[in-house]
Design a protein with these regions (language model features):
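Bacterial N-terminal signal peptides that target proteins for export
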Residues: 2-9
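C-terminal motif of bacterial Sec signal peptides marking the signal peptidase cleavage site
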Residues: 16-19
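Conserved catalytic region of serine esterases and O-acyltransferases that act on ester linkages
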Residues: 22, 209-263
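N-terminal low-complexity, Pro/Thr/Ser-rich intrinsically disordered segments
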Residues: 27-41
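Conserved SGNH/GDSL esterase-like catalytic core that processes O-acyl groups on lipids
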Residues: 40-44, 49-124, 130
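Alpha-helical cap/lid subdomain in secreted, periplasmic
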Residues: 93-205, 214-215, 219-225
Length: 263
């Protein structure tokens, strides 16, 4: 009789534990499904500093790898300025009202050489974005050798100017240039530039994506994958970016350092 009672008791305990495990699994699945159903849209407006090495696609797949459903679109033209995009938007609408997040990338020389124009169009765009309850992010671009020579003769560098303009417009500054500066000082063996000493290398694009990921998601980029893939129009697998094994963790850590206090 006692043995029979023990068997019944063990059976009840087993069924209880099994049901608890299934409930937890179901809860986790439900949470993921809810997170995936709700998505937001992000528009990146700019030039080659935005589209080099598939930055928008890399960023979208970074979000997806963390179960953050943000779709990333771009309006980019090589060498373009924000004042040109302002005119393009007026004549060929960018549908900015459809986006929760909008990234503004002015020409790399404008913060130093044409700061009034840079300020004017950052303000125009930000006011327009605010009208539709969007959030503006200012792409804090880096200084390459030519710009470093110019900024050495001025009271502020590119990153400081763009940071100040962001604050004036209640926009969020994305410290990509600060991340570049940190790598150059502390990890000089990591190459951030193409052979023109201006445009970003694949390593630099990965770093840039990590900085954007942190600022937009509010989460640490440490622990993200080092490569991201998608599919082309024929449904075939393509890799958007593959970052070197020996440096991708360093780039994640740098992105964390420059964003942790401001994201």
């Amino acid at each position: 009789m006692e043995h029979r009672f023990n068997r019944i008791l063990y059976t009840i305990i087993f069924l209880f534990l099994f049901s608890c495990q299934n409930t937890k699994k179901a809860d986790r699945t439900d949470i993921k499904e809810v997170e995936k159903i709700t998505f937001k849209k992000m528009l990146m407006i700019g030039n080659s500093f935005t589209f080099y090495w598939n930055l928008p696609q890399v960023l979208e797949t970074m979000f997806d790898s963390s179960n953050i459903n943000i779709k990333v679109d771009q309006k980019t033209i090589g060498g373009s300025k924000l004042k040109e995009h302002w005119e393009y938007n007026k004549h060929k609408s960018y549908n900015i009202e459809d986006y929760e997040f909008v990234v503004l990338n002015d020409h790399s020389t404008y913060p130093l050489n044409n700061v009034d124009t840079c300020s004017k169009y950052l303000n125009l765009f930000t006011n327009y974005i605010n009208k539709y309850n969007g959030q503006t992010f200012v792409y804090g671009t880096w200084e390459y050798p030519y710009l470093k020579k110019i900024s050495s003769l001025k009271p502020s560098n590119t990153m400081q100017i763009l940071d100040s303009l962001s604050k004036l417009n209640n926009a969020k500054y994305v410290p990509v240039g600060n991340a570049f500066e940190y790598v150059e000082k502390n990890h000089p063996h990591i190459n951030l530039f193409m052979d023109d000493n201006k445009h970003p290398s694949p390593n630099a694009t990965y770093l840039t994506a990590c900085v954007f990921y942190s600022m937009i998601s509010g989460k640490s980029p440490v622990g993200l994958p080092r490569r991201f893939q998608g599919k082309n129009i024929d449904g075939k697998k393509i890799y958007y970016i593959i970052t070197e094994k020996n440096i991708y963790k360093t780039l994640q850590e740098v992105a964390e350092i420059v964003t942790i206090d401001i994201r």
